[in-house]
Amino acid sequence: MDTESTYSGYSYYSSHSKKSHRQGERTRERHKSPRNKDGRGSEKSVTIQAPAGEPLLANDSARTGAEEVQDDNWGETTTAITGTSEHSISQEDIARISKDMEDSVGLDCKRYLGLTVASFLGLLVFLTPIAFILLPQILWREELKPCGAICEGLLISVSFKLLILLIGTWALFFRKQRADVPRVFVFRALLLVLIFLFVVSYWLFYGVRILDSRDQNYKDIVQYAVSLVDALLFIHYLAIVLLELRQLQPMFTLQVVRSTDGESRFYSLGHLSIQRAALVVLENYYKDFTIYNPNLLTASKFRAAKHMAGLKVYNVDGPSNNATGQSRAMIAAAARRRDSSHNELYYEEAEHERRVKKRRARLVVAVEEAFIHIQRLQAEEQQKSPGEVMDPREAAQAIFPSMARALQKYLRTTRQQHYHSMESILQHLAFCITNSMTPKAFLERYLSAGPTLQYDKDRWLSTQWRLISEEAVTNGLRDGIVFVLKCLDFSLVVNVKKIPFIVLSEEFIDPKSHKFVLRLQSETSV
């Protein structure tokens, strides 16, 4: 019978075989493969998550998956062990943490530097027309000609144009940053440079022709400020075209393939740089792709390792270092055993499907009974006073034990236990009770894997990405480009294809060609 060890303070289980005690100790040591928060294991370190997001079940991603069938009475053999080490760290973890800190510091500096430059330039743009109008009033007010009705109308026009420019600039440029990219946006940088040169040229002309000569025609000075504001508005229109409208027309089709399981999606994009296209791919990945589950890959790895471990090579000529000959012998033996391996795979998958269907049926029945109990409690609470009514959280805690065992076994069988903590299940159950959802609506999250956004962020296993491309990431997309988005456990391979040019011709059909004459004879029966 399988036994499990639970470390106090953390949800950590290790599976033991039903053989001798010594073999169980070896299995325990082998199964204590570390997992950090992002799901990456290391042979030299152990990283334990904080108990805030304690999973409902053990994180079996370090185990070899379905090597042994769990006994249904595992709950009666659970042993609590205390006094164990809670934290451990290796030199690899220290190096990785220091590298992440350096990268984060560099990204923060770059982000704040860009924001500072953009803010300074924006402040300069909005203060320049106001300074053009106020400086003559401050320096040579007595020498200026009086401002007539037309001049005052120009001042009102400048005020409203500056207000429109302020709102448009805030809406286009001062939006919350969605991601940190390795390079700057080329068009945005060009627009900032253009605005800077434009404002500097206006200041030079203003200093030479107006400040030095002390121009007395105040109307011309106001008209000069109006021309500056008009030019800034046109630059803002140009920014809208380059940054927003240019990318709306689809020009390329991107095929995104996940390297581990081959799941793929297709997206249509317009003229974008490689790094901006990567951002679009990642934003769609979190809502379109099912969450990455490394536990589903352990069964095939274990089967291949077991298949090769059963092969031994004997050298009848004596000891030698002929590694090439041994490798060839192993490959030949594996090829001879290949004929029977498909039967093993077939029966393993059939047995797994049988267990999944069995435990799914038990889970569905348990959840339906729990929701029937909730409906009965709600009918009873309608007759109680308002102070005695149970809230959805208390109702969820009341019925959860009746379905916990069936849900636990199903999640372990489908290897989803590390994505669902007990707290998240209770919150989802309380949400379903509050909105009067059916048992099927509650089970939909657990019966099939959903997109990444459906789960907590600490279960995503992919928060930091690296963009790998043979070309500069600021270059635009073109046909045949391949770039890779890599995280800790898997990567997304993106293949760019240009949408083909379609030739559509028109063929006119004369409406008279569809007409026909039905001639009836006297003998014809209609």
Swiss-Prot record:
GO terms for biological process: mucociliary clearance; pigmentation. Residues 1-114, 175-184, 246-526 are cytoplasmic. One of its GO terms (cellular component) is lateral plasma membrane. Residues 136-153, 206-224 are extracellular. Its main location: membrane. Pfam families: Strabismus. The modification Phosphoserine is found at residues 88, 90. Heterodimer with Vangl2. Interacts through its C-terminal region with the N-terminal half of DVL1, DVL2 and DVL3. The PDZ domain of DVL1, DVL2 and DVL3 is required for the interaction. This is Vang-like protein 1. It comes from Mus musculus (Mouse). The gene is Vangl1.
